[in-house]
Amino acid sequence: MKLKHIVLGLALTTLLGVIFSNQEVSASSTSSKVVKVGVMTFSDTEKARWDKIEKLVGDKAKIKFTEFTDYTQPNQATANKDVDINAFQHYNFLENWNKENKKNLIPLEKTYLAPIRIYSEKVKSLKKLKKGATIAIPNDATNGSRALYVLQSAGLIKLNVSGKKVATVANITSNKKDINIQELDASQTPRALKDVDVAIINNTYIEQANLKPSDAIFVEKSDKNSKQWINIIAGRKNWKKQKNAKAIQAILDAYHTDEVKKVIKDTSADIPQW
């Protein structure tokens, strides 16, 4: 009788061991598929593309979103391992953030370009712009530089800098139409439309002027000078060694599909970069 109890006890111990072992394997398998993604508070367009990505990854990854309200937060959360990857910024922002915070987050994949545009209430084409016309651009270093590169891309000026180098009006080497560049706070450029011939307005502020991206008379081109403004998915330098690396890769692969490209084109004025 005592022997039976011992045998039964050993059998139960073995059975429980198998159960707990299976549970641990299952939990480990699940955790290796969980990817925490840091984003800014979802806009309808961002939500639409991520909804599609979630469907495409299927059971290869389980995405958990953390929404932030401050642009300083997602990168810090990624560096602190509170999230695995983030999707909210362009190359330029990440590079500057790394320098300022002495971190080494890296771009994992490019996503889209949110081009800035030239608007006008006075002309329907830049070809109609008269000599001596006034153009309003943002006055901060980042957006002002980007605006000048757009003017160069439009054929209105030439600069003696390119790529990542910050451009100022002092870098203008050719201005055949003698355009007058008026530098204003970015938030004031929509109001300036009534007083200037054309204005370069950030996407953030076009609604203030009751404008739509389709109203633009010129759109920033995707070239070597605009590369720094391409949005990206960013993560930690050693992300490929993380236990959820395959799940992260599945998300990157899902983003770069024709299905997501279609969602971006159907729901926004952004330009996919693949």
Predicted regions mapped to residue ranges:
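Ligand-binding clefts/hinges and TM-proximal coupling segments of bilobed small-molecule sensing domains
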Residues: 141-167, 249-274
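Short helix-initiation/N-cap motifs at beta->coil->alpha
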Residues: 65-76, 164-191
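A bilobed periplasmic-binding-protein/Venus flytrap-type ligand-binding module shared by bacterial periplasmic
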Residues: 115-126, 229-244
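Beta->alpha turn/N-cap motifs
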Residues: 42, 69-71, 81, 85-95, ...
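Ligand-binding "clamshell"
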Residues: 96-108, 122-123, 195, 200, ...
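Sec-dependent N-terminal signal peptides of Gram-positive bacterial secreted proteins and lipoproteins
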Residues: 1-27
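A conserved helix-loop-strand patch within extracytoplasmic ligand-binding domains
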Residues: 108-157
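Short, polar/charged alpha-helical segment
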Residues: 34, 40-64, 73, 77
